[in-house]
């Protein structure tokens, strides 16, 4: 059933399926306590250091996961010859570009970690540099920022040892200035009980965890703001796991909610009780 969904669903749903698979591995590999002093080294988001071997073992065991793996590598090869993402707005949104960047950087970074073929890391780096040089990520529609920060954070974290110091600096500055700094303390999504809360909080959390050692005070504020405001989104699942926005937005919001929780667990340990929220 899973492989059917992956092979025949739309690209964004394919990405969500992969994210759920890797979120599962982060649960298996996570530490045991929420303590900033015990922040894991890079890579710390979802697939931690050495986690590739667990994925490879599963690929060798389960044919459905092998097909997903092969599909990602095939799409990564196709990305290598495609034009770089451009900052082209659709009405008031940049969301399509953010999602394209997330898919490309995520797939390419995964392909590099699983194969060690430099062509994937090189192209992922070029994608990250390209969007890092955008003037902004359209903070007036903050979903665009949330997904773009997630894209850059995964690439920065997963390719950390590959990236040149200058490249790290450019990408890190973009995550901070166009992501973390773009979120005002009173942003409305912090008060929302909808997919916006999970998506925007999730993206910002990934950014904070990715660059934590360079801006610890700022990162802690983002993390703690997330822990304070994210339960509003979890309450929307009550009383029986339904979702007031319907099944489509249930899938969108829940995928980012799972990613949010998995990032806390893979980077720090427990998730501060988010996964135990009564209605979630």
Q: What are the functions of these language-model segments?
A:
Residues 17-22:
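Sec-dependent signal peptide hydrophobic core
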Residues 26-30:
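N-terminal signal peptide c-region/cleavage motif recognized by signal peptidases
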Residues 32-38:
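Cleaved targeting-peptide boundary
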Residues 1-14:
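N-terminal secretory signal peptides that target proteins for export/translocation
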Residues 44-59, 65-280:
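Aromatic-lined, polymer-binding surfaces characteristic
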């Amino acid at each position: 059933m899973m492989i059917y969904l992956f092979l025949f669903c739309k690209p964004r749903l394919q990405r969500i399926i992969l994210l759920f698979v890797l979120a599962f591995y982060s649960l298996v590999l996570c530490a045991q306590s929420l303590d900033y002093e015990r922040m894991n080294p890079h890579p710390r988001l979802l697939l931690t250091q050495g986690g590739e071997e667990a994925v490879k073992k599963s690929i060798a065991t389960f044919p459905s996961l092998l097909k997903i793996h092969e599909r990602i590598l095939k799409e990564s090869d196709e990305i290598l010859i495609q034009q770089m993402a451009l900052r082209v707005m659709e009405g008031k949104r940049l969301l399509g570009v953010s999602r394209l960047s997330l898919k490309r950087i995520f797939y390419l970074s995964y392909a590099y970690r699983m194969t060690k073929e430099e062509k994937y890391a090189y192209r992922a780096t070029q994608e990250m540099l390209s969007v890092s040089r955008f003037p902004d990520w359209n903070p007036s529609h903050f979903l665009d920022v949330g997904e773009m920060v997630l894209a850059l954070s995964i690439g920065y974290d997963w390719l950390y040892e590959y990236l040149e110091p200058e490249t790290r600096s450019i990408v890190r500055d973009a995550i901070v200035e166009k992501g973390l700094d773009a979120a005002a303390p009173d942003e409305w999504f912090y008060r929302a009980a909808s997919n916006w809360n999970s998506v925007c909080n999730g993206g910002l959390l990934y950014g904070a965890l990715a660059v934590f050692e360079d801006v610890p005070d700022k990162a802690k504020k983002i993390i703690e703001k997330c822990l304070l405001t994210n339960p509003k989104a979890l309450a929307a699942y009550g009383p029986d796991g339904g979702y007031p926005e319907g099944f489509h937005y249930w899938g969108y919001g829940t995928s980012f909610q799972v990613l949010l929780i998995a990032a806390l667990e893979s980077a720090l340990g427990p998730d501060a009780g988010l996964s135990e929220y009564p209605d979630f």
